[in-house]
Amino acid sequence: MMVVAALLSWFLLGLFIHYSKKFGWGQPIRQDGPQTHLAKEGTPTAGGVAFVLALLLVFVGLLAFGGIGQANLSREVMILLAALGMGVVGGIDDFLKIRSRKFGGKKELLAREKFPLQVLVALLFAGFAAPLASHQLLPGFMSIGGYPIFDMLFIAFVMVGSVNAFNFTDGLDGLLAGVGMIVLLPLVAVSPIAALMVAVLLGFLWFNAHPARVFMGDMGSHAIGAVAAGAYALYSDVWLLPIAAIIPVAAVLSVVIQVASVRLRKRKVFKMSPIQHHFELSGWPETHVTLRFWVVTGIATALTWWLMGGRP
């Protein structure tokens, strides 16, 4: 089914790119970013719609033909619903960006608008997931303080953090697709949703490799972050996710550090945040940043697999 998912993602993305160009669904580019990115102005965005749809269709097919065991069905449905919920939040942002480029008006969801929606989806997921999170939430601890409410809040925190961390990792051709696939690899044998996400990202990467013909947008990055958080929470030790996802963690931390430094010290720590753009402005070609970040993610994920004991 992974092959089917990859091919369906590839096919749907081809259609999406065609109609995006026809209707002018292009990505606006930050003028204060790397100058090499200005040529990307107008590249179709919100490609996450296509690969999330591919994931959903194949998952429904698996359900229809009994391809998902009853033991894991509730976990898989929870992860899927979290991915769709977060994807909708990101999709609203994508819609506003595309519409504003053509017609003006509101350019994006503000942080104070997006964050509460993310928290709502995360809390709904965590409320159902916490009782099923049978592995360690923190090293050596199956629970936090022995109170289920703390476990729920911690899982919700991880979900929101993951979604934003993966979102900040986007911005270079192929970067997030590759990082997302690698982070999910340890769980493909036990989580059909994780396996399908890896597969649909392969189909997406065909078009997103440098020079990218399509960007995933916030819908795609939000869905990837939700699947990563959900799968690690329900099938592994959730504290291992920040190790495997070292690049998304570095991306979100670089933004936090940059904002805090500018507000408190009136000085920047990085040439630009998230951190991938700092390396670009330091002279690294975009493709080098992407490939090296993939390598770092591969090493971190291998360490995660070892810490798992070679099992999810």
Swiss-Prot record:
Per the record, what are the reactions this protein catalyses? UDP-N-acetyl-alpha-D-muramoyl-L-alanyl-gamma-D-glutamyl-meso-2,6-diaminopimeloyl-D-alanyl-D-alanine + di-trans,octa-cis-undecaprenyl phosphate = di-trans,octa-cis-undecaprenyl diphospho-N-acetyl-alpha-D-muramoyl-L-alanyl-D-glutamyl-meso-2,6-diaminopimeloyl-D-alanyl-D-alanine + UMP
A Gene Ontology biological process noted in the UniProt record is:
cell wall organization
Q: Which CDD domains match?
A: GT_MraY (cd06852)
User: Annotated Gene Ontology MF terms?
Assistant: metal ion binding; phospho-N-acetylmuramoyl-pentapeptide-transferase activity; phosphotransferase activity, for other substituted phosphate groups; UDP-N-acetylmuramoyl-L-alanyl-D-glutamyl-meso-2,6-diaminopimelyl-D-alanyl-D-alanine:undecaprenyl-phosphate transferase activity
Identify the GO cellular component terms for this protein.
plasma membrane
- What Enzyme Commission number does this protein have? 2.7.8.13
- Claim: Cell cycle is one of the keywords in the record: yes
Coiled-coil zones: none
Where does the record say this protein resides?
Cell membrane
Cofactor(s) essential for the protein: Mg(2+)
Where mainly found?
A: membrane
Q: In which pathway does it act?
A: Cell wall biogenesis; peptidoglycan biosynthesis
Write down the membrane topology.
Answer: Multi-pass membrane protein
Is-annotated flag, keyword RNA-binding?
no
Q: Which UniProt keywords apply?
A: Cell cycle, Cell division, Cell membrane, Cell shape, Cell wall biogenesis/degradation, Magnesium, Membrane, Metal-binding, Peptidoglycan synthesis, Transferase, Transmembrane, Transmembrane helix
**Residues that span the membrane, as ranges:** 1-21, 48-68, 76-96, 115-135, 140-160, 165-185, 214-234, 238-258, 289-309
Family matches, as HAMAP family: MraY
- Protein task: Catalyzes the initial step of the lipid cycle reactions in the biosynthesis of the cell wall peptidoglycan: transfers peptidoglycan precursor phospho-MurNAc-pentapeptide from UDP-MurNAc-pentapeptide onto the lipid carrier undecaprenyl phosphate, yielding undecaprenyl-pyrophosphoryl-MurNAc-pentapeptide, known as lipid I.
Family of this protein:
Belongs to the glycosyltransferase 4 family. MraY subfamily.
Its name, as the record gives it, is Phospho-N-acetylmuramoyl-pentapeptide-transferase
What is the native source organism of this protein? Deinococcus radiodurans (strain ATCC 13939 / DSM 20539 / JCM 16871 / CCUG 27074 / LMG 4051 / NBRC 15346 / NCIMB 9279 / VKM B-1422 / R1)
Q: Which gene encodes it?
A: mraY
